[in-house]
């Protein structure tokens, strides 16, 4: 049975329940609360209060999302696009990607080794296949070219 979100307390409780599961951005939390039938003015009031109390933090959400997606093997371009679709500011996204402490070239190499067992492409067709996969994962063509030509290999 779904709770009725007709009071500020109910909206706040639902928002806190969602935040207890994982970090959320303000836009995402607003969308979820609206789907549950909460009035927009109550949503804004509840989220403003949660932000003041430090329970809702865009920077914490960005850090958590970047870390999670990077551990899943996604690159900075894909992560940037996903966060943009979630309504976050481009400048905040770029800052989070710069400050996350992830070596993207190393991350790319790990993804490539897991998928292709460290085998360099033997021909143009295989090179295109590997490049497409890595590009879809969110790595730049420059990084991919460096890796597949052997210039990105330190070990």
From Swiss-Prot:
It comes from the Bacteria. One of its GO terms (cellular component) is cytoplasm. InterPro entries: RecX_HTH_1st, RecX_HTH_2nd, RecX_HTH_3rd, Regulatory_RecX, WH-like_DNA-bd_sf. The keyword Cytoplasm applies. Its main location: cytoplasm. One of its GO terms (biological process) is regulation of DNA repair. Modulates RecA activity. Belongs to the RecX family. This is Regulatory protein RecX. It comes from Pseudomonas fluorescens (strain ATCC BAA-477 / NRRL B-23932 / Pf-5). The lineage of its organism: Bacteria, Pseudomonadati, Pseudomonadota, Gammaproteobacteria, Pseudomonadales. The gene is recX.
């Amino acid at each position: 049975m779904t709770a009725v979100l007709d009071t500020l307390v109910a909206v706040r409780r639902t928002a806190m329940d969602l935040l207890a599961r994982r970090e959320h951005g303000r836009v995402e939390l607003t969308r979820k609360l609206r789907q549950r039938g909460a009035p927009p003015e109550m949503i804004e009031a509840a989220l403003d209060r949660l932000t003041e109390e430090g329970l809702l933090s865009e920077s914490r959400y960005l850090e958590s999302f970047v870390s999670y997606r990077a551990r899943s093997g996604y690159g900075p371009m894909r992560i940037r696009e996903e966060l943009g679709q979630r309504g976050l500011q481009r400048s905040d996204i770029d800052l989070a990607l710069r400050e996350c402490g992830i070596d993207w070239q190393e991350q790319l190499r790990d993804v490539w080794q897991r998928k292709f067992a460290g085998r360099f492409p033997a021909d143009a067709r295989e090179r295109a296949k590997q490049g497409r996969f890595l590009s879809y994962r969110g790595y730049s063509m420059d990084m991919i070219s460096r890796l597949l030509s052997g210039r990105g290999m330190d070990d």
